[in-house]
Amino acid sequence: MNIPVSLQSKPPLWLLAELTYRCPLQCAYCSNPLDYAAVKQELSTDEWKDVFRQARAMGSVQLGFSGGEPLLRQDLSELIKYAHELGFYTNLITSGIGLTEQKIAEFSEAGLDHIQISFQASDPALSEILSGSRKAFQQKQAMALAVKKHRYPMVLNFVIHRFNIEQIDQIIELSLELNADYVELATCQFYGWAKLNQAALLPTPEQISYAQARVQAYRQYIDQHHLKTKLLLVAPDYYQERPKKCIGGWGQIFITVSPDGTVLPCQSAKDLPLEFPTIQDQSLKTIWNEAFAFNAFRGTDWMQEPCRSCPDKDKDLGGCRCQAYMLTKNMYATDPVCSKSPVHHQIVEARLQTQCSKPDISDLKLRNPQNSKLFFKRASDADSLL
């Protein structure tokens, strides 16, 4: 494979540390793998520190602490402090469950730069159904205010889907009431548990149009009243005609280390039929530069038609490899989101099906250890029959 030297020599600028798959919530759109409960061993404090040292030596500058719920790691303050001392810009991506004012103060003292808190909905009732926690909504509100009190920008994330998209006005009103600085309205992308629940979660075309119009109206309101809140609406792939560049370019910017030490180009890459090395077996630098899995989709030599001759191939790099594999079972295929894909009709059909289906929220398969273990058992039983 001909990999351009310019791509080989670029360091991963963004390191995502998935500290744990453990989580107190059970969101049906979680991007964690379905069989996450099969992961029994997490990297130790010293192993994570070694990962951070290696990444920083390569040139990584931003470090995200994620999960699962990273607050469940008892060594989180220690890891934040160590990453700060190495010179990382650090970001905590959290549900807010388990967060306290004391912990926020500890994290601030340790050098944490940024905190993002996720919400499920704009009201306690729907939040409880989606998260599985009766107290989650009030806790998130309190911690969003506490983050602001400790002089962090308030950054909120709402995953938008069929069951909460019509709350878009109330979601934005809640964000304004909390005086949020940044609000990410991230329409559900279908990986992990979200893919399992796609038929229930995918919004209708009318819902998408409504949400886009309301966000634009609120942006105008915010400008007219000189408010500081910034609204970012992330459109779903399934309502695009051209694919997005896979994670900013496969093996170009982003690197993920899973709780067990598996090193990935993105969080969903485990779904691909590739062998991904672990940090216990090879150095991060060796994995980034030499592992076949990281070089598999660098450059454009790997592309099949219609990508190979497409004038946009350097712009979108063929789209998302995980999405291509999920829908075609060919990881080299054109992302079916692209209208030039020979199976783009699958995307169109998924949109149309939303207009003739009426899913109930009880249809959702929740992300919890019981369901994960059941999925793992079924997958193991299927493998034993091969």
Curated annotation (Swiss-Prot):
Main EC class the enzyme belongs to: oxidoreductase
Keywords, sorted A to Z: 4Fe-4S, Iron, Iron-sulfur, Metal-binding, Oxidoreductase, PQQ biosynthesis, S-adenosyl-L-methionine
Disulfide bonds: none
Classification via SMART domains: Elp3
Chain ranges of the Radical SAM core domain: 9-228
Family: Belongs to the radical SAM superfamily. PqqE family.
Name of this protein: PqqA peptide cyclase
Organism whose genome encodes this protein: Acinetobacter baylyi (strain ATCC 33305 / BD413 / ADP1)
Taxon lineage: Bacteria, Pseudomonadati, Pseudomonadota, Gammaproteobacteria, Moraxellales
